[in-house]
A protein has these predicted regions:
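Alpha-helical linker/edge segments of TPR/alpha-solenoid repeat scaffolds
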Residues: 28-29, 96-112, 163-179
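Structural signature of alpha-solenoid helical repeat junctions
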Residues: 49, 69, 97-98, 109-116, ...
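Short, charge-rich amphipathic alpha-helical segments embedded
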Residues: 72-102, 143-160
Length: 179
């Protein structure tokens, strides 16, 4: 829990430092006429766009052969996606039964964060396989199957990787539609 708060605080500081800060001007009725949404900025905030940015940076690092940087970026994307998922779930639960719009929004954002977590895990597992560390890839792949279910395309890719590694032997019959 302490590391989650530390990482969250760090992400907030980075997001605030990288995004321009606007002064909030209030109109006579008390509403903000110019709201600065620092955490919503793409790439620099604490949101799914920032996770996508980390994944893209990791992909670029892999393409340039910098596997250590790629691992760092994928790990950071994974951590941020897990935190976002937990926060969205917490907010969804807090507002359930009070205002249906908020849980719907949080559930939608949570599904997006979950998908990004699965993508980060798949990329991290591929990196571990490339570095001849299949034993490190296995738990990450199992997490994808558990989170996304074997019927999803991400779950099928993860399970297929587990077969290729020799961790499991029985092919999944529902995997015929995977691409």
């Amino acid at each position: 829990m302490r590391s989650r708060l530390t990482i969250t605080a760090l992400a907030l500081l980075v997001g605030m430092a990288a995004a321009p800060v606007q002064v909030l001007a209030q109109s006579s009725d008390g509403t903000n006429s110019s709201v600065s949404k620092v955490l919503a900025s793409s790439g620099a905030g604490f949101n799914v766009a920032a996770v996508r940015s980390l994944l893209n940076r990791g992909d670029a690092a892999v393409a340039s052969g910098n596997l250590d940087q790629a691992k760092t970026d994928y790990d950071n994307a994974r951590t941020a996606a897990k935190q976002l998922l937990a926060f969205y779930r917490d907010l969804s639960g807090a507002f359930r039964g009070l205002d249906a719009r908020i849980p719907r929004e949080m559930d939608s954002k949570g599904r997006e964060a979950l998908s990004l977590l699965a993508q980060a895990n798949l990329r991290l597992a591929a990196l571990f396989r490339r570095q001849n560390q299949p034993e490190v890839a296995v738990p990450v792949l199992v997490e994808v199957v558990r989170l996304m279910t074997p019927a999803s395309s991400e779950g099928q890719k993860a399970y297929q990787s587990l077969i290729e590694l020799g961790f499991v032997e029985t092919p999944f019959a529902g995997a015929k539609s995977a691409k």
